[in-house]
Amino acid sequence: MEEAASPARRRGGPAGVSAVQTDTIEALTELEDLERVYAQLCAEEAEVQVELDALVGQQNNIETKMLSLQRMGPNLQLIEGDAVQLSGMINFTCSLAENVSSKVRQLDLTKKRLYQAIQRADDILDLKFCTDGVQTALRNQDYEQAAAHIHRYLSLDQSVIELSKQGGEGSAVEASLALLQEAERNLKTLVTTRLEEAVATGDLPQVERFFKILPLLGLHEQGLARFAQYLCSQLASKAEENLILAVGSDLGERRAPVIFADTLTLLLEGIARIVETHQPIVETYYGPGRLHTLLAHLQKECDKQAQKIVDKFIQQRDYNNKFQVVQSNMMRGMTTDKIEPRDLDPVLCEVTLMNSRAELYFRFLRRRIVADFEVADAMADEAVIQEHQQSLEQLLKNCQLSRTMQELIGYYIPMEEYYMRESVNKAVAMDTAEVGQLSSSVVDDVFYIVKKCISRALTSSSSDCVCAMINHATSVLETDFREVLVCKLRAGYPVSALQDLQRGVSSAVSLMQSSLQQGKITNLTQTLGIESQEQAKSAYLVTLNNVEVCSENISTLKKNLESDCAKLFSQGASSDHAKEKIDSCLSDLVNTSSKFKDLLQEGLQELNNTAIRPQVKPWISSFLSVSHNIEEEEFSEYEANDPFVQQLIVQLEQLMAEFKVGLSPVIYDTLTSLMTSLIAMEMEKTVFKCTFSRLGGLQFDKELRALVAYLSSVTSWTIRDKFARLTQMATILNLERVSEILDYWGPNSGPLTWRLTPAEVRQVLALRVDFRSEDIKRLRL
């Protein structure tokens, strides 16, 4: 409808009225104006016609909608009636609810005022009861009952009391309040004085009696402080007595080496017993969350007594002087004033034991305080919980006992490192190899020392101490001890008396120089080359075995330490960060194993080059002296009396017999593998220098098979891959015709992977005297 009306609006008048007025048309006189107006009227007529057509087209749709609206009329009337009825019901319900709720509110207000009146009456009665009761209790010296009345008075609603003072009974209330306030002051003074007297005389029943009364008077902090004062006096008395006994104990007693650790343990166990005994009393009478306050007072006394014990320990064990001597030795190298490792052993054990007891004590305190705070903070907000957590950490980490233990461990770590290094040097100097043993004593001794030092650090329950000692152990094994083995292997495997002497002199000079420069103790007498040749050979083989055992021991040590550290972690002794640090240190330790494996490979390569290569090369070269350009008669003779391979096998058997006895099975296997690679390489070079007939190629194939079979029997390594090129050469030398190679080459090779290049194949074919060079050149490989 709007679209139909729009042209009329554009024409500036109502619908159906032209924009050109009749008067205007009558006034026109010019033909051009008439034509223009006529054209305009024609255009308007066309627009009107379009509008009419549109309206006529919408007629059916409009009539349908109107009919639909007419049908909806009765329903709309029904809906209107229902809506009016619903509105009336809602208005009625609203009025009814308003009336009921107003009465309920009035009833609630009345009930509240009634309760307030009852509460006020009860409080006034309680006030009167407390006033009478506290006076009677004080006269009878029943301080518990008097405190209960005062506690009841303090728990009354102060606003109700103020209202009562303003009411008709105001004077009576004021009088009762005055009496109660005076009784409160007197009772607080009396109970505090009696508690101080009981603490001074050490009367435990009276101390506990008045300690239980103070929280009823609102004196929680004072009660805990006075009770802690009594406990501290008892603690100090017992600790001083134990320290006197420790200082005066006989040095021959069984526990004499750890007497100060035992004394510290008694002190800490005493505090633990106090907590276990009196924590229920504190929780019952003072409520949860108060244990931290009591322990804060006790910890101060613990710090004093622990410091006395540690001071006596430092004095009696000459701890600081030992540390200074050790530090001087480690910084300046060898000095005349030197401590024997065995003199440090008992001191180090006692220090770790003391720290272990302190860590156990701190874990005990943490568990008890955390459990106490959890009950108290059940409904507390996050800020209070964080505050309690911070106060706990401050108590445990900033106390004097914690700092003292850190100082002791700070001295312990370099002393333990010194003990480890000196003991390892002694083990190296005292190294002996028993007859029939593959390795010498130094390996077991060194790893016993390393394990002992790290295990002792573990007993301290300090993750930082454990990390430090694992790192020091890694350094000792990786540098000091490995360097000893390197120097022994650097002397080489003697092959003759003259070479042995020359090698020994040169090695002695280099080792003496490195020892002087690095300050390391090495067993030079075993590498000077002055012992017999057989002893030098045995020493070299023993060193190889030592290197292998070291590599295995490091891996075993790492696994054992992981298990020990897991036990330490399961006791809650370390955080996640500490676990990550220890895991990182253990990873560095096990990485040292690969360096020993590399050293073993170097030593075996040296042994292979020195003892095996000079022997094997001439044996393989003897293959040249055996003609392989043979006929039937010679082939039969070779079959009856093998000219090469059997002799070679016997020679190899004799050569490796010494190593089989002197080396571990794993090392012997590896050495055999190196020898196998050498044989394959030298054999290949030698074959290229020979010429073959058809039967000669067959003889070579038999010799190669016998050699491979023997070498496979003496090693668990797979050696066929090393002889793959030689096997393929034997195959080529066995061909009847040159063209037969094409049955094995290229797409006809099947699963066979050729290790020989086309040029090498032609070179092998050229070794056959009966193959023409023209046929070989014509091959397309």
Curated annotation (Swiss-Prot):
Q: List every stretch annotated D domain.
A: 614-736
Pfam families documented for this protein: COG4_C, COG4_m, COG4_N
What UniProt keywords are attached to this protein's entry?
Answer: Cytoplasm, Golgi apparatus, Membrane, Protein transport, Transport
Quote a single Gene Ontology cellular component term: Golgi transport complex
SMART domains xrefs: Cog4
**Compartments it resides in:** Cytoplasm, Cytosol; Golgi apparatus membrane
What happens in the null mutant?
Zebrafish mutants are significantly shorter than their wild-type counterparts. Mutants have craniofacial defects with a smaller jaw, smaller inner ears, slightly smaller eyes, and stubby pectoral fins. They exhibit malformation of the inner ear, with abnormally shaped semicircular canals. Mechanosensory hair cells in the inner ear and neuromasts have reduced numbers of hair bundles. Response to auditory stimuli is greatly reduced. Animals show defects in proteoglycan secretion and reduced collagen COL1A2 expression in fins, but normal collagen type II expression in the jaw.
Q: Please describe the quaternary structure of this protein.
A: Monomer. Component of the conserved oligomeric Golgi (COG) complex which is composed of eight different subunits and is required for normal Golgi morphology and localization.
Q: What biological function has been recorded for the protein in this entry?
A: Required for normal Golgi function. Plays a role in the vesicular trafficking between the endoplasmic reticulum and the Golgi apparatus.
Similarity section: Belongs to the COG4 family.
Q: What name appears for this protein in its UniProt entry?
A: Conserved oligomeric Golgi complex subunit 4
Q: Which gene encodes it?
A: cog4
